[in-house]
Amino acid sequence: MEVVAAAILKNNINDYDSFCLTHANANNMKVNAADPLNWGVAAEAMKGSHLDEVKRMVEEYRKPVVRLGGETLTISQVAAIAAHDGATVELSESARAGVKASSDWVMESMNKGTDSYGVTTGFGATSHRRTKQGGALQKELIRFLNAGIFGNGTESNHTLPHTATRAAMLVRINTLLQGYSGIRFEILEAITKLLNNNITPCLPLRGTITASGDLVPLSYIAGLLTGRSNSKAHGPSGEMLNAKEAFQLAGINAEFFELQPKEGLALVNGTAVGSGLASIVLFEANILAVLSEVLSAIFAEVMQGKPEFTDHLTHKLKHHPGQIEAAAIMEHILHGSAYVKDAKKLHEMDPLQKPKQDRYALRTSPQWLGPLIEVIRFSTKSIEREINSVNDNPLIDVSRNKALHGGNFQGTPIGVSMDNTRLALASIGKLLFAQFSELVNDFYNNGLPSNLSASRNPSLDYGFKGSEIAMASYCSELQYLANPVTTHVQSAEQHNQDVNSLGLISSRKTKEAIEILQLMSSTFLIALCQAIDLRHLEENLKNSVKNTVSQVAKKTLTIGVSGELHPSRFCEKDLLKVVDREHVFSYIDDPCSATYPLAQKLRQVLVDHALVNGESEKNSNTSIFQKIATFEEELKTLLPKEVESARTAYENGNSTIANKINGCRSYPLYKFVREELGTSLLTGERVISPGEECDKLFTAMCQGKIIDPLLKCLGEWNGAPLPIC
């Protein structure tokens, strides 16, 4: 019996697969019989490194043409069209037949008197109503859905950003091209012309719950296409246009469209606004995720961190791919870094100068970022599936001669993906804030000045103190935004739409989170560049101090009063050890001050040598104690001048020692910030404020200018961690 049952089951499955393949072929769908639930496709999409995927996104973003066929649209293509950065849209001619077939089916069905939702019936909870005036019904649909508020003439702006509207238009075209919606191809061509001529309908910012799709905002696109008097659009230069002017400027030669049965529903009953904005958000989120990995590596460099936190074995044993990749990227940046080499010498020389292990914000950054990158990557794939989905209702199945009433308009993938992405962004922001807080705190930053102040007089330079307060503000708001949107669903439309995704609301909040994380990333990178320059200044100042102490020691401690060699000559080596070990910025504003550690410890070296000088101390010719005053007086005469000379040379670009960053893999980002954006070391002596420099970088980041230098930092990475050896 079991064998017979198995055979019957196998035959039934084969019959089912055969039916699916036949039906798929009839509708130009791609279905894999071996993967009917699509898990295999989803898993396949996650193969390869995240960085390679980001590189592909950037490459796609920069292509001049986006060809729509309904199944291959990517978030980077949506972001490119949304930005209107020169890319144009082309429709696949091969889709025309399928689109026409579904449109014809609707008309034939209506002519036969077939009862169909939204064609001969009312909508939602009032779908029990009936009408034979299909065109009038679509017109009324658009009228009652024009329920948005724009707040024209008020200080607040309640219009959806142009980029989000353009993204929605592109995604909606892509959905309708698949031929399941019952709309004319000519309408899709008209929307394409609006996009290519940079004519953007005005959509309300609020008013959708993204189930049944984004009804209210999408109705304003339909309103423009049908020439409603309240429809407005922005032209290429931002000028306000009515529907007639928009058509003329876009080169749409047809009259306003008289919607046929189902066409109004096809235009509005979809998730395009939420998923379109989500696509823009995720393009930025993926870039920011890679940036956070590189910033963490630069943080390790300037903090004199121990690079073993990136060792592949540690992360291999944890198994999480996001963590393994984050560690490998940081390892690549740190491998061969001059900062890491110097830090190693420092740790060997005096292992007690800092904690044995770096603090969590540095040491566990791969473990922290890894899961967040996985979340962002999974959300990206989820939204890419959504923008290539058919997400309206009912669906026209021409091959089976029926309309399917379902709920693909439910935008749960958008709401959930955006909530998850926002949580990931908030966690990235928390890490950057923790790293920033260590960087500006002289108790934790291994010798950098408090607040990263770079002036000669620290009492009149508070560096990044204001920026730290701003970072706390940014981080707090970002943490607040991490709260989920999808837990705040309200039953709508006479309890017909009793569960709904809130997809667009979640996308909007995630866009806010992106902007705040860009503010944080900009501020942090400016601070890191300040720290890089301070390490350069520190090295030159220390070199000057060391040379001067050596010179003074040779002059005052080598020879006695009668020309004989003096026992104090053996102090020089220990004096130079003091210079090596003492943090430069703890004394450099007044290097010979008796209240500062350098002068105190130099004196202590001489005292210690005197104490072991024994009987020789009783002889004025061999006494080390009697040399202390001579040494200190000579040092006071010479050292301040040499320090000032070294600082002046640094400021004039004539440093004795070159900046270590020049030979590091993180250099492209530093070069971008300093040379391309024209920023420089901030000091209290200069008028320019931290906010001005951060603003330059934030603007450049929003314009995508940081992408190339960021990827250049990782240009030599082969996609694998260093071998365990």
Swiss-Prot record:
Q: Which SUPFAM superfamilies match?
A: L-aspartase-like
Q: Which CDD domains match?
A: PAL-HAL (cd00332)
- Source domain of life: Eukaryota
E.C. no: 4.3.1.24
Known catalytic reactions: L-phenylalanine = (E)-cinnamate + NH4(+)
Q: Which GO terms describe its biological process?
A: cinnamic acid biosynthetic process; L-phenylalanine catabolic process
List, from the UniProt record, the residues annotated as the active site of this protein: 117
Residue numbers of 2,3-didehydroalanine (Ser) PTMs: 212
Q: Which GO terms describe its molecular function?
A: phenylalanine ammonia-lyase activity
Top EC class, one word: lyase
PTM field = Contains an active site 4-methylidene-imidazol-5-one (MIO), which is formed autocatalytically by cyclization and dehydration of residues Ala-Ser-Gly.
Q: A Gene Ontology CC term for this entry?
A: cytoplasm
Q: Which UniProt key words apply to this protein?
A: Cytoplasm, Lyase, Phenylalanine catabolism, Phenylpropanoid metabolism
Detail which positions bind (E)-cinnamate: 269, 357, 363, 393, 465, 493, 496
Q: Where is this cross-link: 5-imidazolinone (Ala-Gly)?
A: 211-213
Q: Could you tell me which InterPro entries the record lists for this protein?
A: Aromatic_Lyase, Fumarase/histidase_N, L-Aspartase-like, Phe/His_NH3-lyase_AS, Phe_NH3-lyase, Phe_NH3-lyase_shielding_dom_sf
Q: Where does the record place it? A: Cytoplasm
**Function recorded in the entry:** This is a key enzyme of plant metabolism catalyzing the first reaction in the biosynthesis from L-phenylalanine of a wide variety of natural products based on the phenylpropane skeleton.
Report the sequence similarity comment from the record.
Belongs to the PAL/histidase family.
The record's note on quaternary structure and interaction partners says:
Homotetramer.
Protein name as catalogued? Phenylalanine ammonia-lyase
Which species is this record about?
Trifolium subterraneum (Subterranean clover)
The gene from which this protein is expressed is PAL1
